[in-house]
Protein backbone atom coordinates (compact mmCIF):
# COMPACT_ATOMS: atom_id res chain seq x y z
CA UNK A 1 0.00 0.00 0.00
CA UNK A 2 1.25 3.51 -0.83
CA UNK A 3 1.37 6.49 1.46
CA UNK A 4 0.09 10.04 1.73
CA UNK A 5 2.05 13.15 2.61
CA UNK A 6 -0.13 14.88 5.19
CA UNK A 7 0.06 18.49 6.32
CA UNK A 8 -2.23 20.07 8.92
CA UNK A 9 -1.78 23.81 9.34
CA UNK A 10 -3.57 26.59 11.20
CA UNK A 11 -3.21 30.37 11.02
CA UNK A 12 -0.66 29.95 13.85
CA UNK A 13 1.51 27.52 11.88
CA UNK A 14 1.98 23.81 11.16
CA UNK A 15 0.51 21.26 13.57
CA UNK A 16 1.31 18.01 11.77
CA UNK A 17 3.65 17.11 8.91
CA UNK A 18 4.12 13.45 8.14
CA UNK A 19 3.29 10.33 6.21
CA UNK A 20 0.09 8.31 6.67
CA UNK A 21 -1.43 5.29 4.98
CA UNK A 22 -4.95 6.72 5.41
CA UNK A 23 -6.62 9.94 6.56
CA UNK A 24 -10.15 9.87 8.00
CA UNK A 25 -11.95 13.20 8.41
CA UNK A 26 -15.53 14.35 8.98
CA UNK A 27 -16.66 16.78 6.30
CA UNK A 28 -19.92 18.70 6.02
CA UNK A 29 -21.09 15.87 3.69
CA UNK A 30 -20.05 13.05 6.05
CA UNK A 31 -17.00 11.02 6.96
CA UNK A 32 -14.32 10.52 4.28
CA UNK A 33 -11.52 8.00 4.21
CA UNK A 34 -8.64 9.09 2.00
CA UNK A 35 -6.24 6.48 0.61
CA UNK A 36 -3.35 6.92 -1.81
CA UNK A 37 -4.70 7.49 -5.32
CA UNK A 38 -7.90 9.20 -4.13
CA UNK A 39 -9.51 11.54 -6.65
CA UNK A 40 -8.67 15.22 -6.15
CA UNK A 41 -11.11 17.08 -3.94
CA UNK A 42 -11.62 20.04 -1.65
CA UNK A 43 -14.03 19.57 1.25
CA UNK A 44 -15.11 21.74 4.20
CA UNK A 45 -14.37 20.09 7.56
CA UNK A 46 -16.57 19.93 10.63
CA UNK A 47 -15.32 20.33 14.18
CA UNK A 48 -14.15 16.79 14.81
CA UNK A 49 -11.18 14.43 14.99
CA UNK A 50 -8.92 13.81 11.99
CA UNK A 51 -7.57 10.28 12.30
CA UNK A 52 -4.25 9.45 10.69
CA UNK A 53 -3.42 5.78 10.11
CA UNK A 54 0.36 5.62 10.43
CA UNK A 55 2.84 2.73 10.64
CA UNK A 56 2.89 2.84 14.44
CA UNK A 57 -0.91 2.86 14.76
CA UNK A 58 -3.23 5.83 14.73
CA UNK A 59 -2.77 9.51 15.55
CA UNK A 60 -5.64 11.86 16.33
CA UNK A 61 -5.77 15.59 15.70
CA UNK A 62 -8.68 17.69 17.04
CA UNK A 63 -9.61 20.23 14.36
CA UNK A 64 -11.94 23.18 14.78
CA UNK A 65 -13.27 23.25 11.21
CA UNK A 66 -11.50 24.28 8.04
CA UNK A 67 -10.86 22.67 4.65
CA UNK A 68 -9.21 19.52 3.36
CA UNK A 69 -7.54 19.40 -0.04
CA UNK A 70 -6.58 16.08 -1.63
CA UNK A 71 -4.33 16.16 -4.69
CA UNK A 72 -2.44 13.06 -5.77
CA UNK A 73 -0.57 11.68 -2.77
CA UNK A 74 -0.90 14.97 -0.86
CA UNK A 75 -3.49 15.76 1.83
CA UNK A 76 -3.45 19.34 3.07
CA UNK A 77 -5.72 20.37 5.90
CA UNK A 78 -6.17 24.08 6.51
CA UNK A 79 -7.79 24.15 9.94
CA UNK A 80 -9.21 27.05 11.93
CA UNK A 81 -7.68 25.39 15.00
CA UNK A 82 -5.90 22.05 15.46
CA UNK A 83 -4.20 20.19 18.30
CA UNK A 84 -2.51 16.81 18.33
CA UNK A 85 -3.85 14.55 21.05
CA UNK A 86 -0.54 14.56 22.96
CA UNK A 87 -0.48 18.39 22.99
CA UNK A 88 -3.92 18.82 24.57
CA UNK A 89 -3.96 19.98 28.19
CA UNK A 90 -7.00 18.11 29.54
CA UNK A 91 -7.48 20.51 32.48
CA UNK A 92 -7.52 23.50 30.14
CA UNK A 93 -9.93 21.69 27.80
CA UNK A 94 -12.28 20.82 30.69
CA UNK A 95 -12.27 24.46 31.86
CA UNK A 96 -12.99 25.63 28.30
CA UNK A 97 -15.93 23.21 28.20
CA UNK A 98 -17.29 24.55 31.50
CA UNK A 99 -16.95 28.16 30.28
CA UNK A 100 -18.68 27.30 27.02
CA UNK A 101 -21.54 25.54 28.83
CA UNK A 102 -22.00 28.56 31.12
CA UNK A 103 -21.91 30.92 28.12
CA UNK A 104 -24.43 28.76 26.28
CA UNK A 105 -26.76 28.81 29.27
CA UNK A 106 -26.40 32.60 29.55
CA UNK A 107 -26.92 32.97 25.78
CA UNK A 108 -30.23 31.13 25.95
CA UNK A 109 -31.40 33.27 28.86
CA UNK A 110 -30.29 36.60 27.41
CA UNK A 111 -30.86 35.87 23.70
CA UNK A 112 -27.24 36.63 22.84
CA UNK A 113 -25.01 34.77 20.41
CA UNK A 114 -25.96 31.15 21.01
CA UNK A 115 -24.17 29.98 17.84
CA UNK A 116 -20.77 31.18 19.09
CA UNK A 117 -21.36 29.51 22.45
CA UNK A 118 -22.31 26.25 20.70
CA UNK A 119 -19.12 26.37 18.60
CA UNK A 120 -16.96 26.95 21.67
CA UNK A 121 -18.63 23.98 23.39
CA UNK A 122 -18.15 21.71 20.35
CA UNK A 123 -14.46 22.63 20.14
CA UNK A 124 -13.90 21.96 23.86
CA UNK A 125 -15.67 18.59 23.73
CA UNK A 126 -13.71 17.65 20.60
CA UNK A 127 -10.38 18.42 22.33
CA UNK A 128 -11.39 16.34 25.36
CA UNK A 129 -12.43 13.45 23.10
CA UNK A 130 -9.08 13.54 21.28
CA UNK A 131 -7.12 13.60 24.55
CA UNK A 132 -9.09 10.67 25.96
CA UNK A 133 -7.86 8.60 22.99
CA UNK A 134 -4.20 8.92 24.03
Swiss-Prot record:
SUPFAM superfamilies assigned to the protein according to its UniProt record, in alphabetical order: Epsilon subunit of F1F0-ATP synthase C-terminal domain, Epsilon subunit of F1F0-ATP synthase N-terminal domain
Protein name as catalogued: ATP synthase epsilon chain
Assigned keywords, A-Z: ATP synthesis, Cell membrane, CF(1), Hydrogen ion transport, Ion transport, Membrane, Transport
Function noted in UniProt: Produces ATP from ADP in the presence of a proton gradient across the membrane.
Family annotation (Gene3D superfamilies): ATP synthase delta/epsilon subunit, C-terminal domain (1.20.5.440), F0F1 ATP synthase delta/epsilon subunit, N-terminal (2.60.15.10)
GO cellular component: plasma membrane; proton-transporting ATP synthase complex
Principal location: membrane
Family per similarity comment: Belongs to the ATPase epsilon chain family.
Cross-referenced HAMAP family: ATP_synth_epsil_bac
Subunit-structure text: F-type ATPases have 2 components, CF(1) - the catalytic core - and CF(0) - the membrane proton channel. CF(1) has five subunits: alpha(3), beta(3), gamma(1), delta(1), epsilon(1). CF(0) has three main subunits: a, b and c.
Protein's membrane topology: Peripheral membrane protein
GO molecular function: ATP binding; proton-transporting ATP synthase activity, rotational mechanism
Cell location: Cell membrane
Amino acid sequence: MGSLNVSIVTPDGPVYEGVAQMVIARTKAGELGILPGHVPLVAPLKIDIVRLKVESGEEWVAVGGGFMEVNGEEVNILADTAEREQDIDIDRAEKAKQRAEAELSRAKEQKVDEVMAQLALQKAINRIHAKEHS
